[in-house]
Amino acid sequence: MYTKKYSQDIKINNPDKYNLSENIIWSSPHGFDLTMDIYSPKNISVHCPVVVMFHGGGFLIRRKEILNNMAQYIASNHDYIVCNVNYRLLRDQSNTVLFNDLIGDAFGSILWIKENIHKYNGDKEKIGITGDSAGAYICAMILNLGNKIGKKEDFEKDYAFEPTYLPENLSFCLLYTSPSPRDRVR
């Protein structure tokens, strides 16, 4: 009984509470448009914290749309900006996308958000990331990469992730991780 009443009190999607900016192209690696949807609360005068969402799908299937209900729920019931992000899948671009590429896409989206979220009334200093399945793994990689930013000469024997998006005032950025027995996942 309690569950039924509780679910009646929560509105999963109330578009009157948020603005939706759909399919914003934030980068186009090799002509492949990467998009995100941004949900921003209406009638909020302060900069809101940001939730960035990465979808699952085993790095091979699905797109950001599978998290639309979750994004709508957060936007309808909380004062957060929600960024629902697409990244390239391994099967995209005629199966030429490497695992490092999609991690670079995800990290690039965070850099884009930090540079642009103020336009949507978001606080670039308060960004949280979440994901389901493969998206959760991507979140773990992003958090790990943040500890490995450095100069190229410090990591010459390691593999590099290159973010898909770089802010205009940043001319070079490589993110390094230690070598893996596999540099390509199929």
Protein language model regions, located:
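Short mixed-charge
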Residues: 148-171
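Catalytic nucleophile-loop/oxyanion-hole region of alpha/beta-hydrolase
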Residues: 63-64, 70-71, 83-124
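Short glycine-enriched nucleophile-adjacent loop
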Residues: 136-148
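Residue in the alpha/beta-hydrolase core beta-strand immediately N-terminal to the catalytic nucleophile
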Residues: 126-128
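Conserved small/polar residues in nucleotide/adenosyl-binding loops
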Residues: 176-183
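Gly/Ala-rich beta-loop-alpha elbow adjacent to hydrolase catalytic centers
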Residues: 131, 135
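N-terminal cap/lid segment of alpha/beta-hydrolase-fold proteins
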Residues: 3-45
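Short beta-strand element of the alpha/beta-hydrolase
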Residues: 47-56
